[in-house]
């Protein structure tokens, strides 16, 4: 399992959810690799489009390691906070840098390059309480962005947990149950 944290706060809401997912996965026997995006050296995508022909980014930074990890895993768990109804720039940049790795462009629809045997599970947290987080599109926008990337790449959707109104210090029990179910 590849666990990716798209937040600068390891002990924040998304960090807590990801750590819980990692703990559950380890107990279930998964081999887990953890990536903290804010600690990685990932230059911004230059839009050169070479990756569409080569299936890999030409810039040689930490994307090389991330490409290897993403290609080798059975499951990706991406934890990202909601920033202005979307994912933070570091997560969006990861998607941009993986463009040619995740898909090949054709005359009609993108052709997935990830294995259809791979699955993805999403974790996100939003300060806006429910139901306003959903009605106002806050967490919906972030979830849509993450889901679109992985589905376009060909991975199977394994679910999503949204922690809204995260003024609570502990992960809500419904979120814990959903994480456990997805990884068991």
Regions found by a protein language model. Give the residues of each.
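N-terminal beta1-alpha1 ligand-phosphate binding loop
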Residues: 1-30, 126-129, 163-164
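Generic recognition of short, well-ordered alpha-helical segments
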Residues: 16, 46, 89-93, 174
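Residues at the starts of beta-strands that form the adenosine-phosphate
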Residues: 22, 26, 31, 118-120, ...
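A short beta-strand-loop structural module common to alpha/beta enzyme folds
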Residues: 30-41, 160-164
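N-terminal beta-loop-helix "entrance" segment that forms/cooperates
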Residues: 37-56, 168-172
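Helix-loop-strand module that forms the ligand-binding subsite of alpha/beta enzymes
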Residues: 58-147
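Glycine-rich phosphate/pyrophosphate-binding loop and the adjoining helix
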Residues: 132-184
